[in-house]
Amino acid sequence: FSFSMQEVMNTEDGKEWIESSSNNPLNEAKNMKKMMIDISEPIEDDLLRFTADADVIVSGLPMFMSAQAIAEKFSKRHITIQFVPFNPTKEGRATMQPPLPLSKSFMNRVSGYIGQYFTYWIFKDAANKFRKRLGMNPMSYGEYTRAYNRDVPVIYGLSKHGITEPDDWSGDKFITGYWFYDTSSDWQPSQELCDFLEAGEKPIYMGFGSMSNKNPGATTKIMIYALQASGKRGIIYSG
């Protein structure tokens, strides 16, 4: 892709999105919506180019609507992958934010549809602008949920030991187990790291993946303070 998510996360919009996610879900959604509008066009251009000769498109949540537009426009198959339970269900143990997490309830299913409306609202402006470029009508919320819950197979990179497989999901939802990168067979830790690991009890790993931060210095101080207060050793990954 001509686009790097890590680079985007280091922009002011990306940092604002990350900062707002911790204490204000509405601000988080607004910032993510703005960011998607800003970055979606080059991603969609790449999608058009990369899928020109493809029989099947595999998408994640952020580009689901754009991938579905390409699938509809050019008569291609579309599969989506997820790492959190996203399809509505009565099963609280398979609902992302269940009102009744330990029960089967219609309220959990309603919560799932509310969550899908939330994501539809975030992505619809960018995706429907793309559909307009393709000469297509906008995708409504009803069409979004029908595509997500009935028309497009979903593959979950989750374990059945982690979530309960709902009995009210359709047969095209698959929980496959967790996915892992292939490990490099020739990688060796540095001597400095080996010495540190052998010098005491197992350390705590602390890191945020590719996520950026408006004030990395203050965040690092918090992590160091937590290690000192707990009397634990740690390894901090810079990302």
Predicted regions and their residues:
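Generic beta-sheet signal
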Residues: 1-3, 60, 79-84, 157, ...
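Hydrophobic beta-strand scaffold residues
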Residues: 1-2, 78, 138, 204, ...
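Short, charged, surface-exposed secondary-structure boundary motifs
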Residues: 7-14, 88-95, 184-187
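Conserved nucleotide-sugar donor-binding subdomain of glycosyltransferases
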Residues: 14-66, 106-150
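A short helix->loop->beta-strand "cap" motif at the edges of active sites that frequently abuts
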Residues: 74-77, 152, 232
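Donor-nucleotide binding loops and adjacent catalytic segments primarily
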Residues: 158-239
